[in-house]
């Protein structure tokens, strides 16, 4: 499986958010989209998921445009994990997860053994079995994100697109989710994930795409992309980079305002 975007341009009114962006993801690799807030990472992810049309350029899945593939087939080939999610879904968690795998079923009583196994595996992997009879309105932000991850995993899609899946999670669940995403990639799924934590991006992603100033500043292996010079170019501040006990870290240097005497 290969998803490829070529010469993507995205505008907001008269302002160009992204220009001439090329990106591809293949089966078995985990690609991280990183960059400052407002750089267009989520918008690009939505374009890859066929949830937003680009103003220029095209996206193809195995050589076919997403329009030619069609929504029904795309719902089986591409799973999309949105940030936050709708907390007002009234159904139980187990039904919500099943809906990810069976979006076109009117009822879920006729699940096949394969469906049941995929749903159960997804709920176990995302650690939401204990939440199965609750609704989203009664869950914390981190619990909701894990439910949405289970919903995406249940699809068993060729491509998984995840928008900041660890943003609302505690450190333990951040590591568990990132490990789960990497294991999913190792099992043959292409994974694209939007991240702000550069340390997690360096530890878990095979390739990184650094987006800023309307385009791609750099893409490649973490060691190449996460250089102080490139991070400074993207974020507009000098970065301190290093390794502590085998774990990479990336921190902006402290910016101190000038001291002024108060009259």
Residue ranges and their predicted role:
Residues 49:
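Helix-to-loop junction immediately C-terminal to a conserved catalytic motif
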Residues 34-36:
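The feature captures the beta-strand-to-loop junction immediately N-terminal to the Walker
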Residues 110, 135-139, 143:
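Conserved ABC ATPase signature
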